[in-house]
Regions:
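Conserved acidic catalytic loop of the alpha/beta-hydrolase fold
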Residues: 70-87
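Short beta-strand/loop motif that positions the catalytic acidic residue
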Residues: 196, 202-204, 208
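Catalytic histidine-centered segment of alpha/beta-hydrolase-like enzymes
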Residues: 234-247
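Conserved alpha/beta-hydrolase catalytic His-Asp/Glu region
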Residues: 11, 123-126, 138-194
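Conserved HGGG/HGGXW glycine-rich cap/lid loop of the alpha/beta-hydrolase fold
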Residues: 9-61
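Catalytic histidine neighborhood in serine/cysteine hydrolases
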Residues: 217-236
Length: 260
């Protein structure tokens, strides 16, 4: 990965694959980074862009709060920088909100979406703002334990990916986590997402305590023709619970829409 120097910040990004291959853009969840996708297999004949969102990983972490529009604009600028058009955008949780916003704003960039473990609106402003206030006092270490259970399920302590995920979370810049969480708090895409008309696959985890299956299905139902798939035995981050099955779902969707 390498830093992309934008006028106001540096974003850590990685672009792989032939320049003529169909593009896929991967957008990670709150408190994680692009390493989240490391074990997920995708077809080799793709041009895949992944990045660390602002405030995450090796990207710059400006002071909070962040606006969702700014986070969408970051991905838009990266795609323009790399001259990517007609991409399938795969977004998980926060990344799914960004994917929806990008499709609403720049349909020329987005040919299709995979909305994974996400919704048009996640939680309430009151919940997110209270969580931000608490974390600003205590830091991310105390928050991490509850987050592990919500993301990985009740057996989180024995999950082989728990140490890696916990490290990602606690190493996220405090300004970055709070900034992005404030952006989630202020986002409601129900009306604009319902106006989208593009191939969409929505994926839910049966054990997801953050974006339960009914919430994901409700969002899929906003988009005519959207597919919905429930993954059994997985939580909020299917690429950690069952990366092979998760990658196969996404790969099959790409094949169905002729992307690759």
């Amino acid at each position: 990965m390498a830093l992309v120097y934008l006028p106001d910040m540096r974003l850590n990004a990685d672009l792989r694959g032939d320049v003529s291959a169909p593009p896929v853009v991967l957008i990670h969840a709150l408190g994680t980074n692009s390493g989240l996708w490391a074990d997920m297999p995708l077809p080799p004949n793709l041009r895949v862009l992944s990045m660390d969102l602002r405030g995450h990983g090796a990207s710059d972490a400006p002071p909070p709060p962040y606006q969702m529009g700014a986070m969408i604009r970051d991905v838009e600028r990266l795609m323009d920088h790399f001259n990517l058009r007609d991409a399938v955008v795969v977004g998980i949780s926060l990344g799914g909100l960004i994917a929806q916003g990008l499709a609403i704003k720049r349909l020329d960039l987005v040919r299709g979406m995979v909305l994974s473990n996400t919704a048009a609106k996640i939680g309430t402003a009151e919940l997110w703002n209270a969580r931000c206030d608490e974390i600003s006092r205590t830091g991310l270490q105390p928050y991490a334990t509850g987050a592990m259970e919500r993301m990985l399920g009740r057996a989180w302590r024995d999950h082989p990916k728990m140490p890696m995920l916990r490290q990602m979370l606690v190493q996220t810049a405090l300004d970055g986590w709070i900034g992005a969480a404030r952006a989630i708090a202020g986002t409601d895409f129900f009306t604009p997402t319902a106006a989208l008309r593009l191939p969409t696959l929505a994926i839910a985890g049966a054990n997801d305590g953050t974006t339960p299956p009914d919430l994901v299905r409700e969002t899929a139902d906003l988009i005519p023709g959207a597919e919905f798939h429930l993954m059994r035995g997985v939580g909020h981050l299917p690429m950690l619970d069952n990366p092979v099955a998760y990658g196969a779902l996404i790969s099959a969707f790409l094949a169905r829409i002729g992307h690759g």
